[in-house]
């Protein structure tokens, strides 16, 4: 009898745990644009994922990525296109946010794509598996290819919101095109909103003693996988101009993947930021990292 009640207690405990888990979020159609995006993240990484015109998109951001105006910037927009496309014209399309394991999947009977963030490393993984042999094209899209004057309305996102100085500029990003990978980063301009506040408060004489978390801040990342550079293009998305750098898979395959490694650090030397990025890349073990992130 004691064994019976013990087993009953264990069963009830397990059932309660399952009942307490929220249901996955499932969409059965593609989105019109980025306003129909699904959140995804892990650790200090956040993404907005959606499928539009059979392409998979996501915005990407990491905590601490504040520019010279104290605006939390997105790292960029990423577009993934498969040929032949397993998501094109499929009535049984599913996009799912798997809440327990923390990833987004896009599936049809012809294939699937998983997008997930490593909980223990600042890395995003994209994994594709298709029934047919497929070619993959990955594009990094940026709207910060030149210094950009911020409008007064946009200023609400930064620390100048209360004391608008008249002209506020978001500095451009840097893009380093490699044959097999793409490196992108934002290096804060020498003059930051912290410097403006120090001047506004009449504290110039104490400036050397005040901590400025925005000075010499560099943040960005690198796209890498079994990819080769394909070319660039320009376009518009949501009334905003952008430039795209595209990489394609070396050869068609049923299984493909790539990763985006991120890094943020305060340093006046870009090579120090690159060294930190490469250190993270060397520490990665995708299979083990996936298992650890979903425990």
Go through each PLM region and give its residues.
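Sec-dependent N-terminal signal peptides
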Residues: 3-15
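Aromatic-residue-lined binding/catalytic grooves and analogous aromatic/hydrophobic interfacial grooves
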Residues: 21-295
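Sec/Tat signal peptide C-region and signal peptidase I cleavage site
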Residues: 16-20
């Amino acid at each position: 009898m004691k064994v019976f009640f013990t087993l009953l207690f264990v069963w009830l405990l397990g059932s309660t745990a399952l009942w307490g888990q929220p249901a996955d979020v499932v969409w059965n159609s593609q989105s019109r644009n980025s306003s129909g995006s699904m959140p995804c993240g892990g650790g200090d990484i956040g993404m907005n994922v959606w499928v539009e015109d059979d392409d998979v998109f996501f915005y990407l951001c990491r905590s601490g990525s504040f520019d010279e105006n104290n605006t939390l910037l997105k790292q960029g927009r990423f577009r993934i296109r498969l040929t032949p496309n397993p998501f094109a014209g499929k009535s049984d399309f599913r996009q799912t946010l798997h809440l327990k394991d923390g990833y987004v999947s896009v599936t049809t009977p012809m294939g699937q794509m998983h997008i997930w963030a490593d909980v223990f490393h600042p890395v995003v993984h994209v994994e594709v598996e298709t029934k047919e042999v497929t070619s993959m094209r990955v594009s990094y899209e940026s709207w910060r290819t030149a210094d950009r004057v911020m409008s007064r309305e946009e200023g609400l996102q930064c620390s100048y919101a209360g004391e608008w100085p008249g002209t506020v500029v978001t500095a451009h990003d840097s893009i380093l095109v490699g044959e097999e990978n793409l490196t992108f980063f934002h290096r804060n301009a020498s003059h930051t909103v912290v410097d403006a506040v120090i001047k506004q408060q009449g504290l110039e004489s104490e400036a050397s003693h005040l901590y400025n978390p925005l000075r010499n801040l560099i943040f960005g990342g690198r796209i890498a996988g079994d990819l080769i550079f394909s070319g660039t293009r320009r376009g518009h998305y949501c009334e905003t101009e952008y430039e795209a750098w595209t990489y394609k898979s070396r050869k068609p395959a049923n299984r493909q993947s790539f990763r985006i490694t991120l890094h943020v650090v305060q340093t006046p030397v870009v090579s120090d930021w690159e060294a930190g990025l490469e250190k993270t890349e060397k520490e990665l073990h995708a299979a083990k990292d996936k298992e650890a992130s979903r425990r």
